[in-house]
Amino acid sequence: MNDQSLPLLPLVLGRVPKSLRRSLAQEGVPFVDQAVTPAGGRFVIFDSAASTGAHALPGQTAIDLLALRRTWTCDLFAALEDETDVRRGWRLDSLAVSETVARHDKRALRERLLADLRKRLENAGGIWLRLGAFPFPYRSAFNFRIDHDDYDPGDFAATLDAAKGHERAISHYVCASTHAERPEAIARLKGSHVGSHGYWHHTYREAAENAANIRRGVEALQAAGLEPSGFAAPHGRFNRSLLEALESLGVDHSSEFGLAYDELPFFPGDGRVLQLPVHPICLGICLEAAREQQDLGLGDDEAADLCLAHFQRIIVEKHRAGEPIFLYGHPEGRLGRYPHVLRETLATAAGYRDLWRTTLARFAAWWRARGRVTLEVFEYAGQLTVRSGRTPQEHRCALEYFCGPDVARLPLDGPLVSFSAAAPILRSPLPAPRAYPTPFDQADDFRISLRRYLDWERVTPLEEISARTWRGWAKRTLRRIKD
């Protein structure tokens, strides 16, 4: 065996952090496990911090992740696996908005990690080629997720009216306790993508409580004539108890910015529930911020216009960077009162011919199909040949080959695709990483942290709060005192 008989890709992964495997899967760079396919590729990635060596075969080149670690000021692998959240702020012109989101910007960390790995790989004679995140010829994908917490007939109707003509780009996540008994609302949602937002609008700390709430919400929507697909946790919160509940119920996908935001989809905890991160800034937090920062002299109308301008800019920035554009908002008191925010945001997205406007359910199906594709890349006489398998029937896949500062984007048409390694066609400059909006740290409020630790809320009826756990007992006792 010599190095020319082995494919340039897939990468062969030895004992490496889970976050590297996840990042490569998100990126679409093919890889195999060394324990399963030891001769699967020319380059072996290993971590001497966790193993005794590369155990490379003749003709293989080993790349040690320890060399990457030495250039970092923090452990990117650990940060990518972190599941805690923190209060984070952003500035929209003069208005400072804040939300509780994932502690780390996982997109920025993943991009830094993979840029460093790409450099090491190319210096060793390898290439960087990936399966595109979107079907060919799309550059990005767009969805507006509407979270239906409470029900206001006027705001509900105004929101759906504003979305007319753009239904294929809308996903509705519905709280069943407030909507399942509203036949006029159910009737308008039929034919749309509907997901569950729970029965009660609360994300619990215990797996059994989350499972019961999600199951009840799904069953209530089904009884009303809807077939929900997917889940979005109230307040965007994530914890392992929620993931356990979602896994036990076989939920297809979920979306919580408390775990990740503005990032490519991934599977938390090596499970089966696909996480679809969204952009965390919405109309609601803009209105709240304007009311709190009275010294700015901004009314609700001005705050709504700032939010619209932000949505339009984030569409431009994310489209340029080739990122998913997944926005969200609420009808009651927000999009329903300022429907032009939704209407003009949707119109902006519709102006891009290479932007795939789709539901989160359809995007989740695409992402799963993308993850099943296999790629091998061979080099001969200056030509690269990509051999593929298990490509989806519903969509054309895209190959993205990195050549210096440029990227060539080619359709994956057929099981074999060949092109020049030095001068590929359909080549364009690689976009710079997106920097807008720039976050800043916000001090944690001890009272809010304590409430979350105790799982404090007033949504669940007192008689339905279980006292089998200490949190449930404490919450029920405090509710009896306060109520």
Per-segment meaning from a language model:
Residues 300-301, 332-334:
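Short, glycine/charged-rich beta-strand-loop motifs at protein surfaces that mediate ligand recognition
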Residues 52-62:
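BRCT (BRCA1 C-terminal) phosphopeptide-binding modules in DNA damage response/checkpoint, repair
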